[in-house]
């Protein structure tokens, strides 16, 4: 379903996004 797709995308994206956000905090 859609939530499954969003979950899969989040698992791939979050590991890359979190460090970038952390650098700006």
Swiss-Prot record:
* Family to which the UniProt record says this protein belongs: Belongs to the frog skin active peptide (FSAP) family. Caerin subfamily.
Q: Which domain of life is it from?
A: Eukaryota
Choose any GO biological process term that the UniProt entry carries and state it. defense response to bacterium
Residues modified to Leucine amide: 25
The protein's role, per its UniProt record: Antibacterial peptide, that adopts an alpha helical conformation which can disrupt bacterial membranes. Each caerin displays a different antimicrobial specificity.
What InterPro entries does this protein map onto?
Caerin_1
Q: Keyword annotations for this protein?
A: Amidation, Amphibian defense peptide, Antibiotic, Antimicrobial, Secreted
**Where is the protein localized?**
Secreted
| Organism from which the protein derives | Ranoidea caerulea
Which Gene Ontology terms of cellular component type are present? extracellular region
Q: Give the main localization category.
A: secreted
**Which tissues is this protein detected in according to the database?**
Expressed by the skin parotoid and/or rostral glands.
The text the record gives for the protein's domains is: Contains two amphipathic alpha helix regions separated by a region of less-defined helicity and greater flexibility.
Q: What is this protein called?
A: Caerin-1.2
């Amino acid at each position: 379903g859609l939530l499954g797709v969003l979950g899969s995308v989040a698992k791939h994206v979050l590991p890359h996004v979190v460090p970038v956000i952390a650098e700006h905090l």
